[in-house]
Structures are given as C-alpha cells and as structure tokens.
Curated annotation (Swiss-Prot):
InterPro entries: DUF7788 (IPR056690), UCP015417_vWA (IPR011205), vWFA_dom_sf (IPR036465). Residues 543-572 are annotated as: Disordered. Signal peptide: none annotated. SUPFAM superfamilies: vWA-like. This is Uncharacterized protein L728. It comes from the Viruses. Pfam families: DUF2828, DUF7788. It comes from Acanthamoeba polyphaga mimivirus.
Length: 572
C-alpha cells in the first residue's frame, strides 16, 4: 500500500509505475519544472542509464520522437558537469547530429557558461569546450566540401553554418563569445570567418540570408523547413516589407507564394512537416477562423504520414478539455483527438468522445481542418474528467446497438493529464478497474487503453503499473508516437517504452562506462536555483545588453579571453 496514491480529483492511482524509466518517460511534459525533470531523470539514470539516455534522445528527436527543446538540452548540459570528457563527447555528438539541431550546442554553452559564472563550486568543474570543437570541425568539413566540388551538381553539406553564430549576434556577446571561440579554434580572422559563413549559407540557400539580401527569386517554398515556412508566411503573403514599403521584389515574392499555395491545394508540390506538431496547426484555427492553405496542407501531410504507417481499426479518442488542461495541453488534446478520428477506419471514423459529467459522442463534420476544429469548438464541453461515465457511455452504446464482441472498440486513446475523477467513494476501485469489471459483466472484452499524458500534474500520480496488460502510457505533443502504437506487438507500459526506444543506438563508449552519481550538484538548493536561472535566461533570444559599467572576468569556454562580468549585463 506504500505505492498507493490518488489523482488530483481523488481517483485511485500510484506514486510510481514501478519503473523510474517509465516514470520519466510518462510524467515529464513541456510544463514540467526543472526540479521535476532533473530529479526524475536522475532516478531513471540510476535504474538503467542506457534506457534513460535513449529516452533523452527520444525526448529531443525532432524527426521521429517528441521533438522537445529546452528540457533535453538542459538535461544534457547538466550531464556535462558529471561525466568525463570522453563519455560526454560521445553522447552530445549523437544528441546534436542524429536527433537534435546545431542550435542545441549554443544553448548548452549558454546554460553552462551562465551556471559557471553564478556558481563558484562548479566554475572549474569538467571544463570541456567540445561544443566549440564540433562547430569548428563541421564548418571546416563543409567549407572544404564546397570548395573542392568541381562538378556541376550541388554537393550536400550540413546545416551547421545556418546555426553557427555570427559575430554581432546574441551568442557572441559577453559572457558567451561563441563565434569568437569557434573562429579562434579554426584559426581564422574575423573577415575570414564572415566570408566562410556567407559562402556556406549561400550554398544552403538559408532563408534569412535570402530575405535580408532581397534574393526572393531564389526561395523554394517546397524545400523550406516547416517551422520557417510557418513563421514567415505572413511576410510572404504581402506586397510590402516590415516598414510597409512596397516594391517589385515583394510583389513578385507574394505572387510566387500565392502560386505555391495554389499548387499545394492541387497536390502539384510538397510541403515539409518535420518540426511542426499537430497542435501548432490546430492552434492557428483556435485563434483565427480564416482558411489557411499552408495549415491545411501541413495537416494533410502529417495525417498521411500517420496513415501510411498502418491503420487504426475500431479506435476512438477521448479528448480532455477539463479546467486543468487549459492552454497548450488542451490544444494538443483537440489536435491529437481529431488526428486519431481521421486516421481510424470502421464505424468510429470521424468520432470522438468529449469529457463531461455526462460525456457524449461527437461526430466531426467538415471537409477540411478549419471546419473540423470549428466543429470541435462547438462541441459540448465540461470541466470534468469523468472517465467512469465514458466507460458507461461506450458500454451502453454497444448494448443498445447489440454489437458483437468483435465490433466493440478495440483501442481507446485518452488525451489527458491523467487526473481522473474519483470512481469509488471508498477509493478502493480505480476507474480502470471499474471499466474492466463492467465490460466483463456485459460479455465484452475491455478495450486496450492508451493514457496519453499532456500535463505534469501536481500530484505526480500515475494510473497504471509498468506491467499492466492492455494498457500503455505515453506523453508528449508529437504525432510520431501514434505510429509506434500501430506497430506494437505487446501492449503494456514497459513493452511499449522499449518498442518506442528501439531505433535509438548508443555509443559503445557510453554503454561501457560506469553509472556515476548525477545528483550531487542539484542536491544543493543554491546550485539548483542557479541552474534554473541559467536555463530560464537561455530562453531569451536577445537576453542581454551592455551596461555602463564593465569589469574583466574570465570566459569559462575561452579562459584566455577577457570579457565583462555577467552582473554587468541586464535584461533588454
């Protein structure tokens, strides 16, 4: 009974699933506090560092994983203070080149530098400028590749130059000076460094460079990264620049973009979706009712990617929009609910269940995402996570329709924060135990259940144990995990975790290393606060400007360089 807990709404639950790795995989969401995700990762690390590391890779994986940004980067930075150079180098290289983005290295350096400057006890601990070396080595490799190309075809290079900091950007201001450190590592003068970046970015056709130099005719919308395309669509869709000045260049850009959207609607061209998550598209329509062809095409591409991985048969989704799900988690629940409804075949296609004291089926009408989001917005919502009534609804529907056992719902997705209402006044029977009992009594097999966590709750409770058959627990905002469920051979929390992690390969250097204690720094309250501040400050794109007073100090990433103290920089 020591593991017995309760949800925020009183339902029977557990303090832990019985596996620290599952707890980390399921509990940690974008709303998690630093104390939560560092300590939860530490427990997973102590249980099995190899599985914990694979979960961290999946958490960052922008292609087939959860695609989270700041949490995995913060954990990777934290690990740097505990691992020797060889071990850290082996994992950070894979972290960036296989699963993340070159910008991750900039964030790691920033968090590390600010933490060192504010925390004397770690100022000289495990100094290892591997991030600078990775940038320098890759830039040199790409520069050589471009210069040595004598053929007529364009050679492929990495995106390192896109993210490498320029001299006058945020990441080269004190106390960071990352561009200066990279340039010094490469043995280049400032002018040589600038010319190298210009050449590589021109080769990559980096959007920001094409826009700033008015080379609009070179923009290929079908090849633009999804996030860049979404951010810049308003700029593409007007005849003027940001100052309202009209020009022939901007008119031509607008015309080209309009033609691209027309081709998209006819299926004559493509759109990238890597990096865009379903809720970001649904969010466009929750804040605006204007039709957007780019949003529609990106949604269709995501839906096709899920459908091409397999087919959901007799599947339906329960969408939690209770009060605790306000904001982003609610957007995700709506988006993933619509996606499941569209990707399932059979009688439950296009249908979802909404949480309410008296939940109901809701049929999604409309021919496009805009209309389906409006349909969901008009659905009857309630502020209750009454899962017991959902099971009653599904069962009564089957009894009334005289469904045969094989016609019953096969899998039930619950997009939620897992804080279900109390099922039994005595607290002895959980919602799921109730559902299993009622279905069995009626002669039906209880559906497989996917508990998809979208918010880190205050109670930190979990509804299931690691080996509970017929159930899985997931978390995150990405649709990529839907594909894993389609292809899973076993259906319990532990088996599903291992199935999700199958693609992730660890470096032998890391595998063969001993498990070291990674809790020593965060155990100190002052250190914890300083690390949290460093992480929070790294979220600002242009966080600091120079004040009138400057003092000389040592840059932790470049000890020989004189810089100003962090205290002499203030928030913009």
């Amino acid at each position: 009974m020591a593991n017995l807990s309760f949800t925020e709404n009183g339902d029977k639950a557990y303090n832990t699933s019985g596996s620290a790795c599952i707890d980390f995989f399921v509990r940690i969401t974008r709303s998690s506090q630093l104390t939560d995700y560092i300590s939860t990762f530490g427990k997973a690390w102590n249980e099995d560092k190899n599985i914990a590391m694979k979960i961290l890779y999946n958490l960052r994986d922008i292609r087939t994983g959860k695609g989270e940004k700041i949490i995995p980067v913060a954990i990777m930075t934290y690990l740097k203070f505990h691992l020797n150079s060889d071990i850290y180098n082996s994992i950070v290289t894979d972290f960036v080149t296989m699963y993340g983005c070159w910008k991750d290295l900039l964030k790691i350096v920033e968090i590390e530098t600010r933490f060192r400057l504010s925390t004397p006890s770690v100022s000289n601990k495990n100094i290892n400028p591997i991030e600078i070396k990775l940038f320098a080595d890759q830039l040199q490799k790409d520069f050589d590749t471009v210069n040595n190309n004598t053929g007529s075809s364009k050679v492929a290079i990495s995106l390192c130059a896109k993210w490498a900091p320029s001299e006058k950007q945020h990441y080269n201001k004190a106390p960071l000076l990352i561009a200066d450190s990279i340039r010094s590592q490469m043995g280049l003068t400032p002018r040589q460094y600038r010319k190298m970046l210009t050449k590589l970015r021109s080769h990559l056709q980096v959007l920001e460079m094409l826009m700033s130099t008015h080379q609009y005719d070179k923009i290929d919308f079908s090849k633009l990264p999804s996030v860049a395309l979404m951010k810049m669509k308003n700029a593409f869709n007007r005849d003027t620049n940001s100052q309202g000045i009209k020009s022939d260049f901007r008119v031509n850009l607008h015309t080209s973009y309009t033609k691209y959207l027309q081709d998209l609607s006819k299926g004559k061209t493509k759109v990238n979706t890597k990096g865009i998550q379903p809720h970001e598209l649904v969010g466009q329509y929750l804040s605006s009712s204007d039709f957007d062809q780019l949003v529609e095409s990106q949604w269709d591409a995501i839906k096709k990617g899920v459908s091409d991985s397999g087919t959901f048969n007799n599947v339906t989704a329960v969408v939690d929009v209770s009060g605790s799900m306000h904001g982003q988690p609610m957007q995700v629940a709506i988006a993933l609910g619509i996606l499941v409804a569209e990707c399932t075949s059979g009688p439950y296609h296009g249908r979802v269940i909404t949480f309410h004291e008296k939940p109901s089926w809701h049929h999604l009408t409309g021919s496009n995402l805009m209309e389906k989001v409006k349909c969901m917005r008009d659905a009857p919502w309630g502020g209750s996570t009454n899962m017991k009534s959902v099971f009653d609804l599904v069962l009564q529907n089957a009894i009334n329709a005289k469904l045969k056992p094989h016609e019953m719902i096969d899998t039930l997705f619950i997009f939620t924060d897992m804080q279900f209402n109390q099922c039994d006044c005595s607290g002895l029977e959980s919602t799921f135990e109730y559902g299993q009992r009622k279905f069995t009594e009626a002669g039906y097999t209880f559906p497989k259940v996917v508990c998809w966590n979208l918010r880190t709750s205050n109670s930190k409770s979990l509804p299931l144990m690691k080996n509970d058959e017929g159930y899985v627990m997931l978390s995150g905002f990405s649709a990529e995990l839907l594909k894993c469920i389609m292809n899973a051979e076993e259906f319990n929390p532990m088996s599903m975790l291992l199935h999700v992690l199958e693609p992730y390969v660890l470096n032998p250097v890391f595998i063969n290393s001993e498990t070291v204690d990674i809790n020593s720094i965060i155990d100190d309250e002052s250190n914890k606060n300083n690390f949290n501040k460093a992480v929070e400050r790294s979220k600002f794109k242009k966080a600091y400007k120079k004040s009138s007073n400057t003092n000389s100090t040592t840059n932790s990433m470049n000890p020989r360089r004189s810089t100003v103290s962090s205290e002499d920089w203030v928030l913009n």
